């Protein structure tokens, strides 16, 4: 079975996006948005040529082949993040005790969950905004991983351990992530 001598992935850079590569650090800028990420793996080189980001690896092993594809996805997500951004939609569900959800600073506060007297909190990652309106929660930002982690933090804050989720359906649930309806 022949092995490829060179793996090369290319990513088109849109006109309004600037990509800088300093050693192993990739910086993607567009307007006021900027994302920076450290991408370093032995044998893999990242460069820019003719309006494209090029990821290359000579005589790759399985792990290096996988990492080249992973880096391509990371850079593509960075470009999408600074141009369009990412948005997760969550919905608040309750049967008897109405929840009060609010975002202040870098935390989301959930009051009166299942009639509890204390406030449950969820962390908001850097560069992410959370908007609560009625029974809808919208999490948005440029960094896909931070937006997803913030949405997961909010969902996990309302998990009830030891109860059947088919019966006890109170909570905050992700219904749409990065444009995909679940």
From Swiss-Prot:
Keywords tagged on the record: Ribonucleoprotein, Ribosomal protein, RNA-binding, rRNA-binding
Q: Which GO terms label this protein's molecular function in UniProt?
A: rRNA binding; structural constituent of ribosome
Entry's InterPro entries?
A: Ribosomal_uL6-like, Ribosomal_uL6-like_a/b-dom_sf, Ribosomal_uL6_a/b-dom, Ribosomal_uL6_arc, Ribosomal_uL6_CS2
Keyword check for Ribonucleoprotein, yes or no. yes
Pfam families of this UniProt entry? Ribosomal_L6 (PF00347)
A Gene Ontology biological process in which this protein takes part is:
cytoplasmic translation
GO (cellular component) term, any one: cytosolic large ribosomal subunit
Assembly mode: Part of the 50S ribosomal subunit.
| Family statement drawn from the similarity comment of this UniProt entry | Belongs to the universal ribosomal protein uL6 family.
List, alphabetically, the HAMAP family matched.
Ribosomal_uL6_A
Q: What does this protein do?
A: This protein binds to the 23S rRNA, and is important in its secondary structure. It is located near the subunit interface in the base of the L7/L12 stalk, and near the tRNA binding site of the peptidyltransferase center.
NCBIfam families per record: PRK05518.1, uL6_arch
Q: What is this protein called?
A: Large ribosomal subunit protein uL6
């Amino acid at each position: 079975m022949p092995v490829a001598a060179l793996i090369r992935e290319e990513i088109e850079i849109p006109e309004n996006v600037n990509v800088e590569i300093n050693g192993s650090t990739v910086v993607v800028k567009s307007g006021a948005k900027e994302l920076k990420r450290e991408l370093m793996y032995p044998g893999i080189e990242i460069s820019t040529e003719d309006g494209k980001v090029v990821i290359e690896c000579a005589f790759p092993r399985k792990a290096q082949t996988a990492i080249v594809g992973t880096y391509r996805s990371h850079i593509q997500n960075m470009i999408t993040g600074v141009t369009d951004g990412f948005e997760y939609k969550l919905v608040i569900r309750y049967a008897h005790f109405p929840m009060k959800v609010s975002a202040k600073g870098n935390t989301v506060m959930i009051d009166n969950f299942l009639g509890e007297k204390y406030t449950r909190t969820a962390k908001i990652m850097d560069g992410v905004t959370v908007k609560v309106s009625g029974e809808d929660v919208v999490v948005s930002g440029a960094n896909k991983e931070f937006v997803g982690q913030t949405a997961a933090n909010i969902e996990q804050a309302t998990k009830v351990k030891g109860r059947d989720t088919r019966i006890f359906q109170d909570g905050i649930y992700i219904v749409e992530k990065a444009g995909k309806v679940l």
